[in-house]
Regions:
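Non-catalytic terminal and connector segments of soluble metabolic enzymes
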Residues: 1-165
Length: 165
C-alpha cells in the first residue's frame, strides 16, 4: 500500500485526563512519522466544518460543544498528522471503534473512553475514516507550510518542483 496521511485529534477530554503521553506512546507502535502537530483552540467554525457530515444528527450540538472543550473546561485539542504506509488503517485500529463501550478494551478508546449519562461518546481521539476525509480534515486543521512533507501539492509547488528538477 502507498504512503498516506491521517489526521489525529487528541480531544479535550484526552488533554484534561493527561492522556497525551499515553496516546502518543500507543500511536508510536505504528512506526509512522508525525509530519505536523499543534495544540489549538477549536473555533465554532472549525468544529462545524470538521463535523459537517453529522449536522443532521440529534447529538450534533453536543458534539460541537465537546470538540470545542466546553464540556471539559479544556478548550483545546492536540492535532497531529501521521504519515506512512497504511496510516489510516493502522491508526484506526489502535484507536478502536467510535463507541468506547464497543471498542476493543486494549484500544485507545476502549482503554480511556466513556459514554456520558446523556449518551455522548467521549472517545478521547479522532482518526480520519478514509483518505478523502483525511485530505479534507488535514486541510481544515493545517496550512500547507505547517506540514513537513508536501501531502497535497498545490499548483505552485508542482511548478516550483519542475523548475528545480
Amino acid at each position: 500500500m502507498a504512503d498516506q496521511a491521517t489526521l489525529i485529534l487528541i480531544k479535550p477530554d484526552g488533554l484534561k485526563k493527561s492522556l497525551t503521553g499515553n496516546i502518543l506512546t500507543r500511536l508510536s507502535e505504528t512506526k509512522l512519522e508525525i509530519v505536523a502537530s499543534k495544540i489549538t483552540r477549536v473555533s465554532n467554525e472549525l468544529a462545524r466544518d470538521h463535523y459537517k457530515h453529522l449536522k443532521d444528527k440529534p447529538f450534533y450540538e453536543d458534539l460541537i460543544k465537546y470538540i470545542r472543550g466546553e464540556l471539559h473546561d479544556r478548550r483545546k485539542v492536540m492535532a497531529l498528522v501521521y504519515w506512512g504506509e497504511d496510516a489510516i488503517i493502522k491508526c484506526r485500529s489502535l484507536a478502536g471503534t467510535t463507541n468506547p463501550e464497543e471498542a476493543d478494551p486494549t484500544s485507545i478508546r476502549g482503554s480511556y473512553g466513556r459514554i456520558t449519562t446523556s449518551g455522548l461518546y467521549e472517545n478521547v481521539v479522532h482518526v480520519s475514516a478514509n483518505a478523502e476525509d483525511a485530505e479534507r480534515e488535514i486541510k481544515l486543521w493545517f496550512e500547507p507550510e505547517d506540514i513537513i512533507v508536501d501531502l497535497y501539492p498545490t499548483k505552485e509547488a508542482v511548478i516550483r518542483e519542475k523548475k528545480t528538477s
